[in-house]
Design a protein with these regions (language model features):
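Sec-dependent signal peptide recognition
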Residues: 2-9
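C-terminal motif of bacterial Sec signal peptides marking the signal peptidase cleavage site
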Residues: 15-18
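Bacterial signal peptide processing site
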Residues: 20-22
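Post-signal peptide N-terminal segment of mature Sec-exported envelope proteins
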Residues: 27-49
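Active-site-adjacent loop/helix surface patches within enzyme catalytic domains
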Residues: 51-81, 87-89, 94-213
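Acidic/histidine-rich, metal-coordinating catalytic segments
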Residues: 214-232
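Short, low-complexity, polybasic intrinsically disordered segments
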Residues: 230-248
Length: 248
């Protein structure tokens, strides 16, 4: 009798196993849990950039001049470049309005860019140090609205086709009158006005480097001032010597 009961028990157990769910739950001990991803520093993979835009790090720069990255947040102050640059645009900048006692402090200048939502690719300090603010493979916001030689392609659209360079400088009163009164201008230390020899040397080297790598003609038709594109602007102004910037 016990033998029949044991056989019956086995049959019932087999029946329940055969009619259960089609998927059997995996034992917890066999579940593989993916580890939390480690947060890594953001790295720009330059190999993914458009091939027609030469990554700066892949091209030797003029060794006797300093080159430092002092980048603005890419996502907020630039966008991906779709067209190769055809022009280089020259500007001047300072923090003279908000910080008249320290107008060339680079942090103050950078704060001004952020305040007004503008960005250059490069900025050149008084001692000739060149800082990269926005990589060349991205469009910086430096040109604004304007026109060039009645060409609709560039109307209010020069950012897409240019590289912007800022020089830390204060122009003539005519250049600065849109920012301050003559009385305020007269209080500025005259040694702070205009451009330095080191800036001209660094600018000349940078322009040659950019024009060579991007196949931009090294002439005044393609290296232009902000004031030439936008009548609202005055930079690089009366104190800027174009012959020194484009010295061969």
């Amino acid at each position: 009798m016990k033998k029949y009961i044991l056989i019956l028990f086995v049959l019932i157990a087999m029946l329940f196993n055969g009619c259960g769910a089609t998927e059997v739950a995996t034992p917890i001990s066999m579940i593989m849990i993916a580890p939390s991803p480690t947060i890594e520093p953001v790295t720009i993979i330059e190999e993914t950039l458009p091939m027609e835009i030469a990554p700066r790090s892949n091209v030797p720069f003029v060794s006797e001049y300093a080159m430092e990255d002092y980048l603005l947040p890419f996502e907020d102050y630039s966008r991906t470049r779709k067209y190769a640059p055809e022009f280089v645009m020259i500007h001047f900048c300072s923090a003279i309005v908000n910080h008249p006692d320290d107008p060339y402090n680079l942090q103050y200048v950078r704060d001004t860019f952020i305040q007004y939502n503008v960005s250059p690719h490069y900025i050149i300090e008084r001692d000739g140090t060149i800082h990269c603010y926005i990589p060349e493979n991205r469009v910086a916001w430096h040109a604004g609205k304007g026109a060039w030689q009645d060409n609709e392609k560039y109307k209010n659209n020069m950012n897409n086709y240019s590289i912007g360079i800022e020089l830390v400088a204060i122009g003539s009163f005519a250049d600065m009158s849109i920012f301050m009164s003559e009385e305020t201008y007269e209080k500025i230390d005259k040694d702070l006005l205009g451009y330095t020899d080191a800036q001209y040397e660094a600018l000349n080297a940078l322009l040659k480097d950019l024009c060579n790598r991007h196949d931009i003609p090294f002439d005044r038709e393609h290296i232009i001032g902000h004031e030439e594109y936008s009548s609202r602007k005055t930079d690089p102004g009366e104190l800027f010597d174009w012959s020194r910037a484009l010295n061969n």
